[in-house]
């Protein structure tokens, strides 16, 4: 299966896209045995390529023993991108996808997305909030937007599996006005797609988002604000119905604090 949008539909017409992908040169972000990620220029624009070259038997066994489906190609990210865009969640724009082969050990696939630039990850944008607090209105605006995005992502049957603030990109310029605000969720190659996200995987995403935000100076009130938007329910109901989630999040936070203290000794 191959799906090409412009400019690749024109540039690669009559050519083998899998051979063309091999010739792409650019800034390599990740080079693994079975996956390559690079940023390259084409027709005056910047793009990201993720090229999957099968997987290893060791990786398949490791994931199955952990009761997880291994990532076997680029199709997850391609499908997740399109489902998110269908439900109005800002994300990457996919311009090319290809997949061939039935054997998971040798299957080859690729995905090309537009480079989202200029942007800054929320991890970097919020890095100094603990010592240099932002405008309260801006902070609440960002919390509301991320909570809405994650809620809509889960409602669409998608859980991210790497749901951290570094994977939410704030589009620039942003001066604090709501009409300028745009945030895109990225790195969906491990995402899972179903008709409904199981509670276990929902909680993993929420806990990941929580502990990746622990060092940016958020208050307890900020966390409650996020939860009220995400669950679309009164706080007293959330505290009653989500005791398991809250306990897991606090246990995770405690482990991180203890590990940080040990490393500083």
Swiss-Prot record:
Disruption outcome: Mutation of the gene results in loss of phosphoryl substituents on HepI and prevents WaaQ and WaaY activity.
Primary enzyme class: transferase
Top-level taxon in the UniProt lineage: Bacteria
Keywords: ATP-binding, Cell inner membrane, Cell membrane, Kinase, Lipopolysaccharide biosynthesis, Magnesium, Membrane, Nucleotide-binding, Transferase
Catalyzed chemical reaction(s): an L-alpha-D-Hep-(1->3)-L-alpha-D-Hep-(1->5)-[alpha-Kdo-(2->4)]-alpha-Kdo-(2->6)-lipid A + ATP = an L-alpha-D-Hep-(1->3)-4-O-phospho-L-alpha-D-Hep-(1->5)-[alpha-Kdo-(2->4)]-alpha-Kdo-(2->6)-lipid A + ADP + H(+); L-alpha-D-Hep-(1->3)-L-alpha-D-Hep-(1->5)-[alpha-Kdo-(2->4)]-alpha-Kdo-(2->6)-lipid A (E. coli) + ATP = L-alpha-D-Hep-(1->3)-4-O-phospho-L-alpha-D-Hep-(1->5)-[alpha-Kdo-(2->4)]-alpha-Kdo-(2->6)-lipid A (E. coli) + ADP + H(+)
Cofactor(s) listed in the protein's UniProt record: Mg(2+)
Membrane topology according to the record: Peripheral membrane protein
GO cellular component labels: plasma membrane
pH note: Optimum pH is 8.0-9.0.
Pathway field: Bacterial outer membrane biogenesis; LPS core biosynthesis
One Gene Ontology MF term: kinase activity
Protein's cellular compartments: Cell inner membrane
Active-site residue list: 162
InterPro entries, A to Z: Kinase-like_dom_sf, Lsacc_core_hep_kinase_RfaP
Any one of the GO BP annotations: lipopolysaccharide core region biosynthetic process
Catalytic activity, EC: 2.7.1.235
Coiled-coil features, chain-numbered ranges: none
Family: Belongs to the protein kinase superfamily. KdkA/RfaP family.
Function: Kinase involved in the biosynthesis of the core oligosaccharide region of lipopolysaccharide (LPS). Catalyzes the phosphorylation of heptose I (HepI), the first heptose added to the Kdo2-lipid A module.
Name this polypeptide is given: Lipopolysaccharide core heptose(I) kinase WaaP
Organism field: Escherichia coli
